[in-house]
Amino acid sequence: MACVLACVAVLIGAASATASIDFTPIDDGAGLVFERIGALRHVTNQRFLFVQTIDYYPLLQELAKISKFVREPRNNASSCPLVKLVRPGKPRATGGRISKHLASLTQINKEFVSYTLNSADPQNNEVFTDVLEVDYEDTRQQDAAFADAHNPPHWSVVSAADVKELLAVAPPRDRVRVLPHISTANVADKYLKYEACINEERSADNECLYLTEMHGVMASKLADAASFANTLDRLIKQTRRNKLNMTNNVIDDELLLREMRQLSKLLAGHGLGWVVDFERELNAQFDLSQAYKLHLYASQNTVVLCVAMPLVDTAALQYSLYKVATVPFCRGTMCLMMVPAADYIAVTDTRNFYTQVPADFQTQCKAFAGYDEFLCPASQRVPTLDSGECEIEMFMGRYARDIDVQCDMRVADNRPSQVLLGPLVNCRKWVYSFSSNATVSYWCGARDAATVAVPAGVGVVVAQSPLTCSVRVNKDALLFTVDTRSHKAASRAYWPRRRFNYNDYVNTSLLLQTTTSFADTVTDLSAQQLKTLRSRFHIRDYATPRHTFFAPRRSDAAAPDPPHEKPTMLVYVLLGVGVLSALCVVGAYCAFRRYCKQRRSSVVVSFKNDDSQPMVAISNGARAGVHINVPHNNSAPKYEKAFLFPMEIKRTNNKLA
């Protein structure tokens, strides 16, 4: 928290001196602020493996042959002045370097035989001053092992047993891509014919010429061997840093991207896809290594590099990730704090669904700067409608009358010189609350040092450009430093259309009249710190003037009694019952009148079945009867049996009973 405090103080102090710092007051009645820090996508437990193997056994054998050759007495070239000799210790040093690296890797086979230098060998007394130690440099300062120290995601875990199994059988094409095998045998094979030729021509007359050619060949082999040794050395270091580049001469991110593009259609047929969208534009911070996980094993003298790549469900929803922070509402000696249950929430852009964000978000999710998003383990989607969660209801702009029951609202002491800070984006953006005017002294180099006054209130401070500073706040003896040079992704605040406001719920004059000797103090606005507050706040205690003294309610106190009904409520109920009764009486009268009309206007229809279709005319007049008009058609045939004709009824007035 010291870093955050320093960062905010530095940025506030520099606000008046540079345009790169933005100091903006906000409404202190908002309760919570939501900062969108990026997108969030779920990765499945399924993964895709790229496997690269390099066999070092032929190279170790060849180095042993070279060492034996230069030690044989008959190959002594001391009498040949033009021969550029190969030092006897060089092949052994290169072989020892490779063997040492192989021994440091986890073996997938228990029967591995280690190649080591025999220190008891009386001939092994050279000092290898010509051994080249490669110091591989990488821009990353952290070892990737630390990033996955806490329960790595399932897709990234590749054990030695997994590697042994996929090498033993043909792996499925939609889950594993075995890259072309690399063998070190070529180091010796490309010189076989040439060596055979000069060995046949060797004689006492051309001994020096023979040794000159052979030492030249061995020097070339040792150069190739050193290159393979460097490859192994850099693969080990790049695996630790979880970042491939072409300095290993084997595989890098560009090669992986080409392979991934070719496999996209194959994965799409299974409803899966890469975390990389090849139809989408990448930003300047794109780094594929932020998505994959490297594993390096050994199978006897063969190095096995595994690149685990997560897969996403093509039908899965994409979310926006928000940091949730408390906005203090301070009046008098009291500060109301709405404590969020979670530091982060993830909501779809349509705001129809949300999902839980892991508590250990920083370790469970991987930041993927290429799309300004985070890759997290899959979790269930939940409708935002009637979620019952304080953060979601506040995000949606739905505020219940009993908001203090739905949300965890607590009371903190408001000291006269209180300075509270809550991070929104680490060392770049914060919520601040100053109970009084603050004096900030900062030093950002010889050309940027000043003392500025920051007014009291609540707001958000943002660093628009990188800064490295040290600062003192209110002449305190504490010295803080900040470095925001590594931040590149943009973030923005989200406010619901209907913003929450404490003033709609609380009579602030009552807060100003209340003393809070019972309230706890806090040093920052983090959720962990705010949850230590023991006093909960109930709105009804400050909604109307009270005739008794304020009594704080502790977190372990019993639930408050339900409020009493007001007398006006009974009047509204009686009026509603009266209106409903009147409507029922009117409806019954209309129904009875309609029934009487139907009785007076009823008509009986009868006709005689004839050979022709009858036409029935009905009239509801007082003297009108029923007339059945039968068409006279003498040519129609007579039927001896009764025949059922369809009846057509014709209206003669506007009513038909």
From Swiss-Prot:
InterPro entries: Envelope_fusion-like (IPR022048). Residues 1-17 form the signal peptide. Keywords: Signal. It holds the Pfam family Baculo_F. This is Uncharacterized 73.1 kDa protein. It comes from Orgyia pseudotsugata multicapsid polyhedrosis virus. The lineage of its organism: Viruses, Viruses incertae sedis, Naldaviricetes, Lefavirales, Baculoviridae.
